[in-house]
């Protein structure tokens, strides 16, 4: 009886720690956060030149398929920059109590339903704009809170 309860509890804890979102990038077994490089660090609130980082950077190879983290609606395009550089693209997704902005992807669509784990788009070539940076998807909650626990 005790071992059954222990196994059940261990399963619940590992599920909770894994977060409710799907893996973001094809070819990755988990949502690994970008470490530090000369362009900064990928964790939430990492200091940037003028402000703290408002999202989390998930490692992903350029050209890789990017997946929806949860079931919801793609509600529009998001652009992280004021210019028209090669990586200035992304989407906003809302649903299941979540709202996120995902940057540096070429989405398959800018509006409409999407399911958790469904192809959302393709990672853009960050190296063209930031040589030496670790390629990644930027994901941030719409309310600027820390998304790390859901990853």
Swiss-Prot record:
It is found in: Cytoplasm; Secreted. Keywords: Chemotaxis, Cytoplasm, Disulfide bond, Metal-binding, Secreted, Signal, Zinc. It comes from the Eukaryota. Zn(2+) binds at residues 53, 57, 138. GO terms for molecular function: identical protein binding; metal ion binding. GO terms for biological process: chemotaxis; skeletal system development. Disulfide bonds join 25-60, 36-41, 99-142. Residues 1-18 form the signal peptide. Highly expressed in adult and fetal liver and weakly in testis. Not expressed in bone marrow. One of its GO terms (cellular component) is extracellular space. Interacts with MET. Belongs to the LECT2/MIM-1 family. This is Leukocyte cell-derived chemotaxin-2. The gene is LECT2.
